[in-house]
């Protein structure tokens, strides 16, 4: 209610001068720069309306009181409706800017070990985009209003455009920040993350308005010279470059190291030059420290590599948090939640929050929630095309293809499978044995024959005889091959080989391998390989220990883990130490080691598993033979030979008795992170791909729910009454602006250009309506600009900052861009307009005159109040409060009241000065 009451006071300021007049004040020529604003005409304003850029004067020019009221209502309602239209087209405009600034490029990163990896990073620097396209998008009405006002009035300076820029700056600095401070929930606070950039933009913001005062009241009072106007415009790229340097720590940031700390008593930030520190810098990072793991080395690499590393760490942290919250879900299920969670919690641009606020206000719904609902309704991708080999033919192969048997087993049984097909044919397939290291006749019995699969049969067995001997020998193997497939009908009659699709085929594995294990030795114990690569997400790794060259007797085999670069004790893996007991004729055992899942994007740590000396549990004849020489009793030659043979059969370690285990990152986890980085691009959420999509979106009413569920999107609720009302109020604008090219066309530039033109037309209409409203009620353009026009252009930014303050983890998106926008408004808005006008009048041989009185007073007042505002924000970084936004209830309410009071005083003093109640400059 306070802003409404303030507007009423402003409207009443000019009334006392006009109550006693029977007729309107006659029209006078506009005063020049040398005229005093204290003249009766300058103090009370004029009821005589002038033609606008697009709108003519409403005839007749001398209406009655009732007609004046009706006209004022029409102008005011039309102006509000135009503000709604500008907000909606700005929605499209900001979406195109988000698409443009979200463009990515691939970079190749070479690590210290020579390995390379490819990633994608944004082409646009965040700070540069915020101060250029983002600032242009959020301040386009103010900037274009100034340019159109000057160019549309014969290059004469007006009061509406500059007043709107200063008034909008005051509203953003005081009211928007006050709202952001207040809406943070109790007990929470938000800090500016990139404080260095904030210092630079805040300094330029204050300098911009100091510079305005200097060129209006000091250098050349009442006249803007060409060099002043051009220098104002040049300050815009200079400001952007300085902010970019601060963000990148270039020049003096590179050569002068500073330590920043906060005095616990005063809360003042203290800097001291010196060696590279290891304390917290202004942006919250640690200088001189590296991130653990290989990616930490990227901290000294290119900025793109650091940016990619930061994006990966954010996504990894999201997956870790969700895994702790939902331990029962697998990675695929977590990815579905993580997509929404990443969109919800990632740092968002000013464009996103502006679009989100506009759509919530106009009944278009929550951007993220609608995107999640559309993704859920969208049919999933197919699992892939069917296998080319799955053509309806039966497939015949060994299952399994590897067999092990002891030398004394007598025979080994092999299985052949028949899968697929129609099951109404008879198949004949031949088999035969082939020598390997085992020879037919001495180690196994040669065999060949034919297997017959009748209709419906899916498995056939064949048996191969094994020859036993008492000679100690190494493990040997031979092969069994399938060949010569023939097809018959159900009765078994062979069918001719036609040219059509085959009914059956032999597929791999066609060759089975049979390994004969010697049973005359206790065995050689070893790992299957010297090296084992495991993924950190495995949880538990199973390591096989094989017993070859014999399997006689019971053997106990000790083992233990040894640290390498990986650390045991639960850091990278759990220590394992124990014994494996191999029974008689047992050829394989498995030991388990638990791996700790650190969920790292890149990882390569190793540890070792060592086997101890095997112990033969002395039982039966082996124990007797080995213990015969322990006593004094002499043994015979036969006994000595038997003992020697038994000694040869003792268990021993093989060559691979030490296994190196390399723990690597989970490839599924790594792929998930890469997919999430690609899919969490907000340009995919707020952008449009076709006109059809835009028109459907324009006529659809959605619930404007600001609350977000971190566990994923909830069920879509029905729109409220407010959503329907706002939708029907704005449906004309929505359908009209659905004709704008989709953001996907020309990478967003087509939409960008059309939106600029549309915003320009609407801004010209707003300027004319505001001017006609002011002259109808007797309100001066300077007051009209700082109150009504500035308020109308800044309302969407207020809601955008509110949403950003609630949803972002830091304060940069909500208030960090306020100072940058204020500076850009002056340098770009006034710089372009005044440069064009100054050059035009210089060519004509005349000066470009600008009345300094009201504008200079407003600029000075705003600058003083802005110093107070920034000082309070920095003071709020004390530990007792916690940050620029939120904090304890007392300081939060006090800050909100102070900032709203500053805005109230700014409007009041500017209005009093405009109506000559107080003396200005």
Curated annotation (Swiss-Prot):
UniProt protein name: Sodium/calcium exchanger 2
Domain comment in the entry: The cytoplasmic Calx-beta domains bind the regulatory Ca(2+). The first Calx-beta domain can bind up to four Ca(2+) ions. The second domain can bind another two Ca(2+) ions that are essential for calcium-regulated ion exchange.
Where, per UniProt, does this protein localize? Cell membrane; Basolateral cell membrane
Residues the entry annotates as binding Ca(2+) 6: 598-600
Q: What positions are modified (Phosphoserine)?
A: 622
What the record says about disrupting the gene is:
No obvious phenotype. In hippocampus pyramidal neurons, calcium exchange activity is reduced by about half, suggesting that other, additional calcium exchangers are active in these neurons. In these neurons, the neurotransmitter glutamate triggers a sharp increase in cellular Ca(2+) that does not depend on calcium exchanger activity. In contrast, the decrease to basal levels is mediated by calcium exchangers, and is considerably slower in mutant mice than in wild-type.
Q: Where is the signal peptide?
A: 1-20
Glycosylated residues: list them: 125, 130
Q: What is its main location?
A: membrane
UniProt: Ca(2+) 5 binding residues: 536, 598, 600, 665
User: What highest taxon heads this organism's lineage?
Assistant: Eukaryota
Q: PANTHER family in the record, alphabetically?
A: SODIUM/CALCIUM EXCHANGER, SODIUM_CALCIUM EXCHANGER 2
Which UniProt keyword terms apply here?
Answer: Antiport, Calcium, Calcium transport, Calmodulin-binding, Cell membrane, Glycoprotein, Ion transport, Membrane, Metal-binding, Phosphoprotein, Repeat, Signal, Sodium, Sodium transport, Transmembrane, Transmembrane helix, Transport
Q: Where does Ca(2+) 3 bind?
A: 407, 469, 471, 473, 518, 520
Q: Which residues form a coiled coil?
A: none
Question: Which Gene3D superfamilies does the annotation name?
Answer: 2.60.40.2030, NCX, central ion-binding region
Q: Provide the residue span(s) of the region labelled Putative calmodulin-binding region.
A: 248-267
Residues noted as binding Ca(2+) 4 in the record, renumbered to the chain: 443, 469, 473, 476
């Amino acid at each position: 209610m306070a802003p409404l009451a303030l507007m009423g006071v402003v409207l009443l300021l000019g009334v006392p001068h006009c109550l006693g007049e029977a007729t309107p004040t006659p029209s006078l020529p506009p005063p020049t720069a040398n005229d005093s604003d204290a003249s009766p005409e300058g103090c009370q304003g004029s009821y005589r309306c002038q033609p606008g850029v697009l709108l003519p004067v409403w005839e007749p020019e001398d209406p009655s009181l009732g007609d004046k009221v009706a006209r004022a209502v029409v102008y005011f309602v039309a102006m509000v409706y135009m503000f709604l239209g500008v907000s909606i087209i700005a929605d499209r405009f900001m979406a195109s800017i988000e698409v443009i600034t979200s463009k990515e490029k691939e970079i190749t990163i070479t690590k210290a070990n020579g390995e390379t990896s490819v990633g994608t990073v944004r082409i646009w620097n965040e700070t540069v985009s915020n101060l250029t396209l983002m600032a242009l998008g959020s301040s386009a009405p103010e900037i274009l209003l100034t340019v159109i006002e000057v160019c549309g009035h014969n290059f004469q300076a007006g009061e509406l455009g500059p007043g709107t820029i200063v008034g909008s700056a005051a509203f953003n600095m005081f009211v928007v920040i006050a709202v952001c401070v207040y809406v943070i929930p109790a007990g929470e606070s938000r800090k500016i993350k990139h404080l260095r950039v904030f210092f630079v933009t805040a300094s330029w913001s204050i300098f911009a308005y100091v510079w305005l005062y200097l060129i209006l009241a000091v250098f050349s009072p009442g006249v803007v010279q060409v060099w002043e106007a051009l220098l104002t415009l040049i300050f815009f790229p200079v400001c952007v470059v300085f902010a970019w340097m601060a963000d990148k720590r270039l020049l003096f940031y590179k050569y002068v190291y500073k330590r920043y700390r906060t005095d616990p008593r005063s809360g003042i930030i203290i800097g001291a030059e010196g060696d590279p520190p290891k304390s917290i810098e202004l942006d919250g990072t640690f200088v001189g420290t590296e991130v653990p793991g290989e990616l930490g080395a990227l901290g000294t690499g290119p900025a793109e590599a650091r940016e990619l590393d930061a994006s990966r760490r954010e996504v990894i942290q999201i997956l870790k948090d969700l895994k702790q919250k939902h331990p029962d879900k697998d990675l695929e299920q977590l990815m579905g939640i993580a997509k929404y969670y990443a969109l919800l919690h990632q740092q968002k641009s000013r464009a996103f929050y502006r679009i989100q606020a506009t759509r919530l206000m106009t009944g278009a719904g929550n951007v993220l929630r609608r995107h999640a609902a559309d993704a859920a309704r969208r049919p999933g991708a197919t699992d892939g095309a069917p296998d080319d080999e799955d053509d309806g033919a039966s497939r015949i192969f060994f299952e399994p293809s590897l067999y092990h048997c002891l030398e004394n087993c007598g025979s080994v049984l092999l299985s052949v499978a028949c899968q697929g097909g129609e099951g109404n044919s008879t198949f004949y397939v031949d088999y035969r044995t082939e020598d390997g290291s085992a020879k037919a006749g001495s180690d196994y019995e040669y065999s060949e024959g034919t297997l017959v699969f009748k209709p419906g049969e899916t498995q056939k067995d064949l048996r191969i005889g094994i020859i036993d001997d008492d000679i100690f020998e190494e493990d040997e193997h031979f092969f069994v091959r399938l060949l010569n497939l023939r097809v018959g009908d159900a009765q078994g009659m062979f069918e001719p080989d036609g040219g059509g699709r085959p009914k059956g085929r032999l597929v791999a594995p066609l060759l089975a391998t049979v390994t004969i294990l010697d049973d005359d030795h206790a065995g050689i114990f070893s790992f299957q390989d010297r090296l084992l690569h495991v993924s950190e997400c495995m949880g538990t790794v199973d390591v096989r220990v094989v017993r070859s060259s014999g399997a006689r007797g019971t053997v106990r085999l000790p083992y233990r883990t040894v640290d390498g670069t990986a650390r045991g004790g639960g850091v990278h893996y759990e220590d394992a130490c124990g014994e494996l007991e191999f029974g008689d004729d047992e050829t394989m055992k498995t030991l388990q080691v638990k791996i700790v899942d650190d969920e790292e994007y890149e990882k390569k740590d190793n540890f070792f598993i060592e086997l101890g000396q095997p112990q033969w549990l002395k039982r039966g004849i082996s124990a007797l033979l080995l213990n015969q020489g322990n006593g004094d009793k002499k043994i015979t030659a036969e006994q000595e030979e038997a003992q020697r043979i038994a000694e040869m059969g003792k268990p021993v370690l093989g060559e691979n008795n030490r296994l190196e285990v390399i723990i690597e990152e989970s490839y599924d986890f790594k792929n998930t992170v890469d997919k999430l980085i690609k899919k969490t691009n907000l340009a995919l959420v707020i952008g449009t791909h076709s006109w059809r999509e835009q028109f459907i979106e324009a006529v659809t009413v959605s619930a404007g729910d600001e609350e977000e569920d971190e566990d994923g999107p909830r069920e879509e609720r029905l729109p409220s009454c407010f959503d329907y009302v706002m939708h029907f109020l704005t449906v004309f604008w929505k359908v009209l602006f659905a004709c704008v090219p989709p953001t996907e066309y020309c990478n967003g530039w087509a939409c960008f250009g059309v939106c600029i033109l549309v915003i320009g037309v609407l801004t010209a209409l707003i300027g004319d309506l505001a001017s006609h409203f002011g002259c109808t009620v007797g309100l001066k353009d300077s007051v009209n600009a700082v109150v009504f026009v500035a308020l109308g252009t800044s309302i969407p930014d207020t809601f955008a900052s509110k949403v950003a303050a609630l949803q972002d983890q830091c304060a940069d998106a909500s208030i960090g861009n306020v100072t940058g926008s204020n500076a850009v408004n002056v340098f770009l808005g006034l710089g372009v307009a005044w440069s064009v006008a100054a050059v035009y009048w210089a060519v004509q041989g005349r000066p470009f005159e600008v009345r300094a009185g009201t504008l200079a007073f407003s600029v000075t007042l705003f600058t003083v109040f802005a110093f107070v505002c920034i000082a309070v924000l920095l003071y709020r970084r004390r530990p007792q409060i916690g940050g620029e936004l939120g904090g304890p209830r007392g300081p939060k309410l006090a800050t909100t009241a102070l900032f709203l009071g500053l805005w109230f005083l700014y409007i009041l003093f500017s209005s009093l000065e405009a109506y000559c109640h107080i003396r200005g400059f």
